């Protein structure tokens, strides 16, 4: 459970418990803020940032910051949400990459995820911004660092410029010349890290800054490092004048609340967050969207963006047409599940929806079933997926069960879920064609 889940559930529970069937008054405000403060501190939010949030919420709640007709519960959520946005940085801070080639200098301590983040950023800029990106390996000290970058670049089809153990400053200068000659839009410098900040590291980074004049200097910090990331950020910023911060591993631990404090304490924007190991698990940071998640409002904007980026519109339209014609089969289901999987895990997608009634265990069980169903369908021939009626043959059924390594019970569950879902879709289609409004809450495929 990531820090967002931990903090979100604690704050929502506190507000709901103290504000249910009530109006805002000094007593329930005091009790709610006491519990929210404890939630913030337990999530490792810096004490000064926590005080700022609590004091501002208290002033607004007691100072008549009330919308007519809204419940105490709605009011408190609105006020806390606004203060979270303010603490997180108010607005999204996009990269300054209009110059060609633009230089992005990645800095940070060893273990922060700097090298993998450099590759993720290259992938993001290429896919989303249509930029031609050159990765430059400059970490000549950590064994295998440059080789790691080369391998990562191969996975994302990103070219890597490296000169082995050559002086990093010289390599960076040569990389810039190469980028200009070969029409690259962005150059990402993967600099050396250290176990701790030292003068040797800072001198090398300062030389790189002077020679390459980067448009952006991004500090990569480990979101699981606690309050230490504030000190690290300040040390790097004092020496290099950072343009922003990238926080990694936000999905890894409940005590990641120091992230909430970075912008407030350092006045630097969080530009990106890493929420997984995949090379597509880096996202631009939007304070409002993070606050939405923390307050249980979901994150529809990010969900929509992921859908646009990963789902083939023509394929969806084709599937919808087949559904309305009653021709939907297991091949269609398999294809749609594969497209949804590109958007991320079911757990992450569900958290982007403004719903609170689905428990963590229910989501995990649904995720498990989807994985099992996909394995079973992968073990079928195209003919079997296109015409599920042939699966009634015992020999086919046994072959699929054996080939997939799943059980007969799981096979039957897939077929029953599919048949039930298909029947419900047909009923909905008939109602639409006859001009009646279907009850969509009863339709669809149940997992």
UniProtKB/Swiss-Prot annotation:
NCBIfam families hit by this protein: ffh
UniProt GO molecular function: 7S RNA binding; ATP hydrolysis activity; GTP binding; GTPase activity
EC id: 3.6.5.4
Location(s) in or outside the cell: Cytoplasm
Functional description taken from the UniProt entry: Involved in targeting and insertion of nascent membrane proteins into the cytoplasmic membrane. Binds to the hydrophobic signal sequence of the ribosome-nascent chain (RNC) as it emerges from the ribosomes. The SRP-RNC complex is then targeted to the cytoplasmic membrane where it interacts with the SRP receptor FtsY.
Catalyses which reaction(s): GTP + H2O = GDP + phosphate + H(+)
Top-level taxon of the source organism: Bacteria
This protein's record includes keyword Mitochondrion: no
Entry-linked PROSITE patterns: SRP54 (PS00300)
Signal peptide start and end residues: none
GO cellular component assignments: signal recognition particle
Entry remark concerning the domains of this protein: Composed of three domains: the N-terminal N domain, which is responsible for interactions with the ribosome, the central G domain, which binds GTP, and the C-terminal M domain, which binds the RNA and the signal sequence of the RNC.
Family: Belongs to the GTP-binding SRP family. SRP54 subfamily.
Protein name: Signal recognition particle protein
InterPro entries found in the cross-reference section: AAA+_ATPase, P-loop_NTPase, Signal_recog_part_SRP54_M_sf, Signal_recog_particl_SRP54_hlx, Signal_recog_particle_SRP54_M, SRP, SRP54, SRP54_GTPase_dom
Keyword annotations from UniProtKB, A to Z: Cytoplasm, GTP-binding, Hydrolase, Nucleotide-binding, Ribonucleoprotein, RNA-binding, Signal recognition particle
Gene designation: ffh
Sequence positions that bind GTP: 108-115, 190-194, 248-251
Oligomeric and partner information: Part of the signal recognition particle protein translocation system, which is composed of SRP and FtsY. Interacts with RNA.
GO terms, biological process: SRP-dependent cotranslational protein targeting to membrane
A Pfam family hit: SRP54_N
């Amino acid at each position: 459970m990531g820090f967002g889940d931990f903090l979100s559930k604690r704050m929502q529970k506190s507000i709901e418990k103290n504000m249910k069937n009530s109006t805002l008054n000094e007593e329930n405000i005091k009790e709610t803020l006491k519990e929210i403060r404890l939630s913030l501190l337990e999530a490792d939010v810096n004490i000064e940032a926590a005080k700022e949030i609590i004091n501002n919420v208290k002033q607004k709640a007691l100072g008549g910051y009330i919308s007519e007709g809204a419940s105490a519960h709605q009011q408190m959520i609105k006020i806390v949400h606004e203060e979270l946005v303010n603490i997180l940085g108010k607005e999204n801070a996009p990269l300054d990459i209009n110059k060609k080639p633009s230089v992005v200098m990645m800095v940070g301590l060893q273990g922060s995820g700097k090298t993998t983040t450099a590759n993720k950023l290259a992938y993001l800029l290429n896919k989303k911004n249509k930029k031609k990106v050159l990765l430059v390996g400059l970490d000549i000290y950590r064994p295998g660092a440059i080789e790691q970058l080369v391998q990562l670049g191969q996975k994302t089809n990103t070219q890597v410029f490296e000169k082995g153990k050559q002086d990093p400053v010289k390599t960076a200068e040569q990389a810039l010349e190469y980028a200009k000659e070969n029409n690259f839009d962005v150059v990402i410098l993967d600099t050396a890290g250290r176990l701790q900040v030292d003068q040797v590291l800072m001198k090398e980074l300062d030389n790189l800054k002077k020679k390459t004049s980067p448009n952006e200097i991004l500090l990569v910090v480990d979101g699981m490092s606690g309050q230490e990331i504030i000190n690290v950020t300040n040390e790097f910023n004092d020496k290099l004048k950072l343009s922003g911060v990238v926080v990694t591993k936000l999905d890894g631990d409940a005590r990641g609340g120091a992230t909430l404090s970075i912008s407030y304490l350092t006045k630097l924007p969080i530009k990106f967050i890493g929420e997984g190991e995949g090379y597509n698990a880096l996202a631009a940071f939007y304070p409002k969207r993070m606050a939405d998640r923390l307050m249980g409002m979901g994150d529809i904007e990010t969900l929509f963006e992921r859908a646009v980026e990963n789902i083939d519109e023509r394929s969806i339209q084709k599937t919808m047409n087949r559904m309305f014609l009653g021709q939907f089969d297991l091949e269609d289901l398999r294809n749609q599940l594969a497209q949804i999987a590109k958007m991320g895990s079911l757990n992450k997608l569900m958290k982007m929806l403004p719903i609170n009634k689905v428990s963590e265990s229910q989501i995990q069980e649904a995720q498990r079933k989807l994985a099992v169903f996909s394995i079973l369908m992968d073990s079928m021939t195209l003919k079997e997926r296109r015409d599920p009626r042939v699966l009634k043959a015992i020999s086919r059924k046994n072959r699929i069960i054996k080939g997939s390594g799943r059980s007969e019970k799981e096979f039957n569950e897939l077929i029953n879920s599919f048949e039930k879902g298909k029947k419900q879709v047909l009923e909905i289609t008939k109602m639409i064609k006859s001009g009646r409004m279907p009850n969509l809450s009863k339709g669809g495929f149940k997992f």
